[in-house]
């Protein structure tokens, strides 16, 4: 698995309930751009429209070597390739419990197919975000103390 991009902000802003791997329907120039890691997953989300899942907000920059007459839309919606059962299950859960679906990681699998790890998430409140920052700082401090203790 070759990691292309990850959405670190999603781990901070959301509580991740369940994850799933989905394929992406891409153009050839977009796959080439992914191989050069010219992608940004920062503010992406998934919408289910007429029984199909689409990924919005992913910015895939086109290559510099592309023809002048061919300028693809860098922020176009991209279709996700999922099984119908998984899609229906997540659609019901998301609508019933007011949950969202976001992309976490974009990568190439062993067969060199572009895949995205999507997650069913629940938004964190401000105090939850503060709590996670405190825990992160505390863990960092503990690791530094342990390192200093064993170093001598």
Curated annotation (Swiss-Prot):
What Gene3D superfamilies does its record include? 2.40.280.10
Which GO terms fall under molecular function for this chain's record?
RNA binding
Please verify whether the record's keywords include RNA-binding.
Answer: yes
- GO biological process terms held by the UniProt record: trans-translation
Q: Under the cellular component aspect of Gene Ontology, which terms does the record hold?
A: cytosol
Q: What triggers expression?
A: By growth at pH 5.0 in exponential phase.
**Main localization of the protein described in the UniProt heading:** cytoplasm
Q: Which UniProt keywords apply?
A: Cytoplasm, RNA-binding, Stress response
Query: Could you name the domain of life of the organism this protein comes from?
Result: Bacteria
- Fetch the HAMAP family from UniProt: SmpB (MF_00023)
What family does this belong to?
Answer: Belongs to the SmpB family.
**UniProt name for this protein:** SsrA-binding protein
């Amino acid at each position: 698995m070759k990691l292309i991009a990850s959405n670190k902000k999603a781990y901070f802003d959301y509580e991740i309930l369940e994850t799933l791997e989905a394929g992406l329907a891409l153009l050839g120039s977009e796959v080439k751009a992914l191989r050069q890691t010219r992608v940004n997953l920062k503010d992406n989300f998934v919408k289910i429209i007429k029984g199909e899942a689409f990924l919005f907000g992913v910015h895939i920059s086109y290559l510099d070597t592309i023809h002048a007459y061919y300028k693809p839309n860098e922020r176009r919606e991209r279709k996700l390739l999922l099984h119908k059962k998984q899609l229906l299950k997540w659609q019901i859960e998301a609508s019933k419990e007011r949950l969202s679906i976001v992309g976490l990681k974009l990568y190439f699998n062993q067969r060199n197919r572009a895949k995205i790890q999507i997650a069913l998430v629940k938004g964190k409140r401000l105090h939850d975000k503060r709590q996670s920052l405190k825990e992160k700082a505390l863990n960092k401090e503990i690791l530094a103390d342990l390192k200093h203790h064993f170093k001598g």
